[in-house]
């Protein structure tokens, strides 16, 4: 069984933090070739200015302790990626609400990690997550029965290579993925109990982390 870890970057153990930065570099810079402005020359880790104290990192480890997935959650009440990524001329209504969190830097194999990330967001008070996906990933989510709500233009009319969409964190959404919110919450390992009132928030010893390949969604 994989282990799901959640916490602020500053709260994660140093070895896990370094492994996460290297994993993100391997996926988003080396494999996908994203031109990320905050990546310094000759460095092999990937962070940006959004990886601060408002941001929650989610890390998936294999039973052997290898990093095989990651995600990043940011509250829309603070600066977040979509607002910077998209121009004001896009005419999008960017949310600013404690119940809406942005999902970014998501990489995982299959759909195993995604419901866990949804559960982390729900544990932080979110009732909805927003983010960008490619049309192919949007189709994948729809095949699983998720109700994607388009925040921007419908993909059939949009000229962008990605789609801005939202998912409501309802019991039905978890059920579509064969998951239960309470069960997922209890399986998440929190570092330094970020949300004391959240059921299932615990601190555990984390096994040694190393990188492994992952499919990106």
Predicted feature residues:
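Short glycine-biased active-site loop of nucleotidyltransferases that positions the nucleotide triphosphate
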Residues: 48-50, 154-155
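Residues that flank catalytic or metal-binding motifs in active/ligand-binding sites
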Residues: 54-56, 69, 99, 161
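Short amphipathic alpha-helix that is part of the acyltransferase structural core
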Residues: 1-46, 52, 57-67
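Short beta-strand element of the conserved SAM-dependent methyltransferase core
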Residues: 58-61, 73, 163-167
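Charge-rich, low-complexity intrinsically disordered segments
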Residues: 105, 159-217
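Short, hydrophobic/aromatic-rich beta-strand segments within well-structured domains
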Residues: 57-59, 72, 117, 130
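Short, His- and charge-rich active-site/binding loops that engage polyanionic ligands
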Residues: 61-94
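Acyl-donor binding region in acyl/amide transferases
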Residues: 81-163, 167, 171
């Amino acid at each position: 069984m994989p282990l799901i870890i959640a916490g602020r970057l500053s709260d994660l153990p140093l070895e896990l933090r370094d492994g996460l930065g290297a994993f993100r570099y391997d996926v988003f810079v080396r494999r996908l070739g994203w031109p990320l402005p905050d990546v310094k020359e000759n460095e092999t880790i990937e962070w940006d200015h959004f990886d601060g104290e408002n941001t929650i990192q989610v890390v998936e480890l294999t039973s052997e302790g290898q990093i095989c997935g990651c995600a990043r959650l940011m509250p829309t009440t603070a600066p977040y990626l979509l607002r910077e990524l998209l121009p004001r001329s896009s005419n999008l209504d960017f949310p600013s609400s404690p119940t809406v969190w942005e999902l970014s830097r998501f990489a995982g194999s299959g759909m195993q990690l995604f419901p866990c990330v949804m559960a982390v967001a729900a544990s932080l008070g979110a009732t909805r997550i927003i983010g960008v996906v490619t049309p192919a990933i949007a189709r994948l989510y729809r095949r699983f029965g998720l109700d994607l709500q388009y925040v921007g233009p419908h993909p059939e009319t949009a000229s962008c290579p990605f789609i801005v969409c939202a998912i409501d964190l309802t019991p039905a959404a978890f059920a579509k993925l064969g998951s239960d919110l309470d069960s997922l919450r209890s399986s998440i390992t929190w570092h330094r109990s970020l949300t004391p009132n959240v059921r299932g928030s615990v601190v555990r010893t984390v096994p040694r982390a190393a990188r492994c390949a992952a499919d990106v969604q």
